[in-house]
């Protein structure tokens, strides 16, 4: 039997149309997320960005990591850039109060913004981080106990970044509760290169100004890079056997190695960087799926690291 050419043509059109509908439904647009930070030179930042990327890869997202290389002001224009690119979400690692214009641009475009070890702000959905209050208290109390509540302490701080500012503030409070502990100097290092080099230089100057053995009992650092710089300065000055106690926060691989070696660098607090990154990715996924996050801060657990456990696998 001869087929009807008109019927055949109509059937072909119908099949083609159905195929197009199926393709349109099956090929959903890939979720695009921008991660913006001026602090990628810091090991901690590198680790939780990697954690975010790993979690995002499992979710099939397209992640664009933007490093403004220490330029906080540039974060605003980078946020505006990705808003114009119509990303689905933005993750920042910077003080949100310093990039308000960018956050407002994202809000106006209805693009959710998340903090990853940043700080809290009404324009952020939430901030995923470690509990800086607890970490600082733990290391400051460690220092106070190790020096028997007396002596000069050098502090390395960085008040321009909220998660680190909190640590310094809490350590100040702990030390002020010990009448015989004196904060000899509160140092803010240049972090453009990561912080080790300038911290070493500043510690060398402090050591030179305080040459008497025992004149410096401890160095409390709000993160590991200054602690490592201080360690280098102390060892280079031949004062490694003096018993100066050094503590940091982050427990990055270099710090763990130094702690395991049993020298002046005695303790740090291990942040779960991969956990911060993956938890931030989960928060993004929940919001993009239509869920609401009530917490302004989501804390990821930490652990004190000393020589006893420094070699343990994280």
PLM segments and residue spans:
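A residue-level marker of the well-folded mature domains of exported/periplasmic proteins
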Residues: 3-6, 22, 27-314
């Amino acid at each position: 039997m001869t087929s009807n050419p008109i019927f055949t043509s109509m059937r072909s059109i119908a099949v083609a149309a159905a195929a197009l509908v199926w393709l349109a439904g099956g090929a959903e647009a890939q979720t695009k997320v921008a991660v913006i930070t001026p602090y990628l030179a810091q090991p901690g930042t590198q680790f939780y960005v990697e954690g975010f990327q790993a979690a995002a890869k499992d979710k099939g997202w397209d992640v664009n990591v933007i490093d403004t290389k220490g330029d906080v002001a540039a974060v605003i224009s980078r946020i505006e850039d990705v808003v114009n690119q119509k990303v689905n979400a933005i993750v920042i690692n910077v003080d949100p109060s310093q990039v308000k214009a960018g956050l407002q641009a994202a809000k106006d475009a209805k693009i959710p913004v998340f903090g990853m070890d940043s700080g809290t702000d009404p324009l952020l959905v939430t901030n995923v981080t470690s509990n800086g209050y607890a970490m600082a208290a733990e290391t400051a109390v460690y220092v106070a106990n190790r020096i028997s509540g007396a002596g000069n302490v050098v502090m390395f701080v960085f008040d321009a970044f909220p998660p680190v500012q909190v640590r310094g503030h809490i350590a100040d409070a702990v030390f002020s509760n010990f009448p015989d502990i004196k904060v000899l100097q509160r140092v803010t290092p240049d972090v453009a290169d990561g912080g080790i080099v300038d911290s070493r230089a500043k510690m060398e100057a402090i050591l030179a100004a305080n040459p008497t053995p025992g004149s410096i009992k401890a160095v409390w650092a709000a993160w590991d890079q200054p602690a490592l710089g201080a360690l280098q300065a102390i060892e280079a000055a031949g004062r490694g056997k003096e018993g100066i106690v050094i503590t940091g926060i982050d427990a990055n691989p270099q710090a763990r190695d130094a702690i395991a070696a049993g020298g002046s660098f005695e303790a740090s607090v291990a942040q779960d960087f991969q956990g911060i990154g993956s938890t931030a990715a989960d928060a993004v996924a929940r919001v993009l799926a239509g869920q609401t996050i009530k917490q302004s801060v989501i804390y990821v657990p930490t652990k004190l690291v000393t020589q006893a456990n420094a070699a343990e696998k994280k």
